[in-house]
């Protein structure tokens, strides 16, 4: 009887260890994916920040590689340029890394849906407000250029607005998303205030 109990215990222990090993491998794989994503962000050509500098009073709207240059944070020209994911993010445990990746995904989906479903109508309203009508092509470029900068802004706010321990993840994700959405609106407003006449739609035809 004793031998059977020991044998059963050892089998259960071995099963538990194997499950934990699998879980650790999954976490390591997710951590590598996060590190790869961070490295990719650092290797990007900085969204031509050196040229645009996110200062809309100096902004010249130009096409570089087929895109427009829309700065997501005109009031803080150094925030994106100085943002380094690897240096700003402290060394945290794998579980926290996993939670951070999940939050990032939630926020990204929230803002991406906002850009797809709400911004086109908001952009049209702002065009009327600033008397700066865009044609469909330039309107598309504006939204897509902002979409490319979305991850940088999310990382920026996640590094500066820490999640409180008792804050539900969904509430924190919504809070960060709202900050990014406000940046989007400000960027569009500044863009429309300084848009060159040649980029405006032919509304008088």
Curated annotation (Swiss-Prot):
InterPro entries: Spore_germination_GerPC (IPR019673)
Entry superkingdom: Bacteria
UniProt keyword RNA-binding, yes or no: no
Coiled-coil stretches noted in the UniProt entry, renumbered to this chain: none
ATP-binding recorded as keyword: no
GO biological processes: sporulation resulting in formation of a cellular spore
Pfam families attached to this UniProt entry: GerPC (PF10737)
Induction of its expression: Expression is sigma K-dependent and negatively regulated by GerE.
Keyword tags: Germination, Sporulation
Known function: Required for the formation of functionally normal spores. Could be involved in the establishment of normal spore coat structure and/or permeability, which allows the access of germinants to their receptor.
Protein name from the UniProt record: Probable spore germination protein GerPC
Biological source species: Bacillus subtilis (strain 168)
Biological classification of the source: Bacteria, Bacillati, Bacillota, Bacilli, Bacillales
